[in-house]
UniProtKB/Swiss-Prot annotation:
One of its GO terms (molecular function) is myosin light chain kinase activity. Residues 146-460 are annotated as: Disordered. CDD domains: STKc_MLCK3. The gene is MYLK3. ATP binds at L521, G522, G523, G524, R525, F526, G527, Q528, V529, K544. It comes from Pongo abelii (Sumatran orangutan). Belongs to the protein kinase superfamily. CAMK Ser/Thr protein kinase family. PROSITE patterns: PROTEIN_KINASE_ATP (PS00107), PROTEIN_KINASE_DOM (PS50011), PROTEIN_KINASE_ST (PS00108). Residues 158-170, 183-196 have a biased composition (Basic and acidic residues). This is Myosin light chain kinase 3. Disulfide bonds: none annotated. It catalyses: L-seryl-[myosin light chain] + ATP = O-phospho-L-seryl-[myosin light chain] + ADP + H(+); L-threonyl-[myosin light chain] + ATP = O-phospho-L-threonyl-[myosin light chain] + ADP + H(+).
Amino acid sequence: MSGTSKESLGHGGLPGLGKACLTTMDKKLNMLNEKVDQLLHFQEDVTEKLQSMCRDMGHLERGLHRLEASRAPGPGGTDGVLRVDTQAGWPEVLELVRAMQQDAAQHGARLEALFRMVAAVDRAIALVGATFQKSKVADFLMQGRVPWRRGSPGDSPEENKERVEEEGAKPKHVLSASGVQSDAREPGEESQKADVLEGTVERLPPIRASGLGADPAQAVVSPGQGDGVPGPAQAFPGHLPLPTKGEAKAPETPSENLRTGLELAPAPGRVSVVSPSLEVAPGAGQGASSSRPDPEPLEEGTRLTPGPGPQCPGPPGLPAQARAAHSGGETPPRISIHIQEMGTPGEMLVTGRGSLGPTLTTDAPAAAQPGKQGPPGTGRCHQAPGTEPGEQTPEGARELSLLQESSSPGGVKAEEEQRAGAEPGTRPSLARSDDNDHKVGALGLQQGKSPGVGNPEPEQDCAARAPVRAEAVRRTPPGAEAGSMVLDDSPAPPAPFEHRLVSVKETSISAGYEVCQHEVLGGGRFGQVHRCTEKSTGLPLAAKIIKVKSAKDREDVKNEINIMNQLSHVNLIQLYDAFESKHSCTLVMEYVDGGELFDRITDEKYHLTELDVVLFTRQICEGVHYLHQHYILHLDLKPENILCVNQTGHQIKIIDFGLARRYKPREKLKVNFGTPEFLAPEVVNYEFVSFPTDMWSVGVITYMLLSGLSPFLGETDAETMNFIVNCSWDFDADTFEGLSEEAKDFVSRLLVKEESCRMSATQCLKHEWLNNLPAKALRSKTRLKSQLLLQKYIAQRKWKKHFYVVTAANRLRKFPTCP
């Protein structure tokens, strides 16, 4: 019994052990299957690599065969004959080449001389046009008449007769008005005449006044003149004493006595301007126009003074040495501009070249000038005979005078020096004026003398202004020369509307916009772009009409709208509205009228310099950098998808986001579209794309801008793609000969097959080629608009600060000083 039971138990335990063994066996088989699968995958990878290696070896073998074929020598007999023939013809070819080089050099020199001549003529024409554009002198020259010679309607026959007699008594060396007109056409004489006067001004007595004037260091008091006041027997040369009739009328008619001065005294705060083309050097015969009435009032306090220039008559008897020291001989006509303010008892006379000096009013008593004897009213510069006060200076001359005055860098400094050297008996006072107070105050014109104190030597102001004018001409800023080319490096203008989030409207576009079907701005695989106008605002826009045939097409349009809703940059086109219909979708976008960048490249009339390409490329990189910051890939960058804002500027906007995609780092994106000429190698190989894909296209565009050629263009699309896959390109020797190494380095670091080796948009913006634009502009002899605007801003700030200083000082003078 016990034996049978044990046997039965042994047989029952065997099935349990078998099941455990089978389970273990299954696990091992599964593990073996997994390992076999891994081996198979590894084998496939190895096979692919071997196949690619075989293909590379095949390419290498074909290349070696081509190289051997190109180096293989020809038949022995014919080769020797050909070498002898070619060697015999070499000297003749060299001589012809040398002759051609000499002829080309001669022609180049001639063309360069002709170009310089044409440039000089252009600058001269521009200068003459700018000078006479708003001047009445042009009318005088064209009409052949001299209006200031005409008698005033208010002049009596007796006065006209006296004027004719006085004009007949002039010396022969006095210039006529016609001579003044002819000399006004030669601006080159101005600097010579100013230099002559600058050499003689050192022998003149100094100007002693409370206002601004010439530099005190430039004038030396001559011996024998106490305190710079001429004696009773001294007078300036070439001056006639005031007529007796004028002396008799002076105390009776003060308004007529004002006519004896260089300028008519207008209302307080008004400015009197003398045209730069109508004033001449000192002459003789000046006392004839002293007592003429003034029937015609001045407009804005301006007047022309032709004929002999302002003279300073005084008592007769000046010796010949003083005469030579004052006039320096017969001086030809001189062009100048005067601004005079008559708001205070001591009038300030201002020249347009930075010279300021006081003039004496007619109501100053003669007792204030001890040691000086003469008729009343002789303390001011007198007006030449035949001068008409009714003639007006053009508005441009008044603006030119103020501009030239403000361009003098030593104006404020000279004012402070002159104040320090003022006489103890004089005290500056604030001139009261209405609207012109701020303008004139900035130039330091609001100074006068206290009543009862005269100007000891007002006549010296006429000659002391000449060297200051000549110095101001030499101080012309370097930005004022004509003929220098200015490049607009300013950023692209923003869209004429605020950035908005656009949603598709299922209405007709004609409800709110007027589309010009006949005016096509562009087109492509998507459809056409027409110009349109918003009916409510009249805003010019562009309507991109996209044909849709399937649901996928509509999804692509919505993807483009979603991407453009995220873009708000000046170098990226902005979306304004969107409409959807049964067969099409319409995107209303910002409108620019400069045309495609591709047209700039292909236009033979438009020559792109390297600096132009730098400006274009920098803006392209800025737009691409903004896209990549928002994780957007354009994937269709090409010159046709870059628009210029205008026909001549360098501002661009990137368009056409139909192929753009949102980049997600965890997702692998593959695309198989785009223009073959600008595709990156990873797109051709249908591999994963990323930000470097756009940078490859930027490199191709830069290459085309620099050379006008395409680096990978083949005869067919297949050949083009083969060049791209092999990254087969080089710098064309002819087109890249004169370009900088920085430009070549920029392109070389973008057209790299390995994506990780290409520069990013941030690195491109930091590249040396796209930076330091002022130095590049200086080397290419051009100027940047940003530099001009910066200089203008700095000058405005400087003069504004000076204006505040002068205004504050003038306000402080209002407070009475303690006794």
